[in-house]
């Protein structure tokens, strides 16, 4: 009716099929992050050890950056993508909502892009890592909903989601 306000359901029905499954977007982000991490690490090693390039002045020691990128940048995308896809099947639960995994994907992806920019503009470092944490935390409520779904075997899903929660801390 004219003038009547109606709630509209947010949906991605018109989006490409790529966005309709959590593992697709998260695995792409993880693979991209893996390639970017390898490129950055190769650049750093070539500069520091082979002396092929000018040594950059990073805001953190290079081994710390490498550890951060691998531990919190590369692997989590694959873990989130897998658990958001397989977890509901293990637990006979409803699938993870599109907005849950797409918001996590967007925030974590933006955070890691910001992190790479922060390597040259250190003032962006906390903002970038804050976006990564926000994305990580955006995914957790949906995963905890799946983990708390009653089923015969919850040990595995509780361990994985508990580990992801611990990783956010």
Can you say where each PLM-predicted feature lies in the sequence?
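Hydrophobic alpha-helical transmembrane segments of multi-pass integral membrane proteins
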Residues: 1-169
